[in-house]
Amino acid sequence: MIEVLLFGIVLGLIPITLAGLFVTAYLQYRRGDQLDL
């Protein structure tokens, strides 16, 4: 049961981590565009 619980936690954290990285990269990209302008 512990393995299943850890597996569920990992599956839940992966999309959140990817979303966080995507948002961070997007904000830095927009910030770079604004600095260029």
Curated annotation (Swiss-Prot):
The keyword Transmembrane helix applies. The chain crosses the membrane at residues 5-25. It is a single-pass membrane protein. One of its GO terms (molecular function) is electron transporter, transferring electrons within cytochrome b6/f complex of photosystem II activity. The keyword Cytoplasm does not apply. Keywords: Chloroplast, Electron transport, Membrane, Photosynthesis, Plastid, Thylakoid, Transmembrane, Transmembrane helix, Transport. One of its GO terms (cellular component) is chloroplast thylakoid membrane. GO terms for biological process: cytochrome complex assembly; photosynthesis. Pfam families: PetG. It is found in: Plastid, Chloroplast thylakoid membrane. Component of the cytochrome b6-f complex, which mediates electron transfer between photosystem II (PSII) and photosystem I (PSI), cyclic electron flow around PSI, and state transitions. PetG is required for either the stability or assembly of the cytochrome b6-f complex. HAMAP family: Cytb6_f_PetG. Belongs to the PetG family. The 4 large subunits of the cytochrome b6-f complex are cytochrome b6, subunit IV (17 kDa polypeptide, PetD), cytochrome f and the Rieske protein, while the 4 small subunits are PetG, PetL, PetM and PetN. The complex functions as a dimer. This is Cytochrome b6-f complex subunit 5.
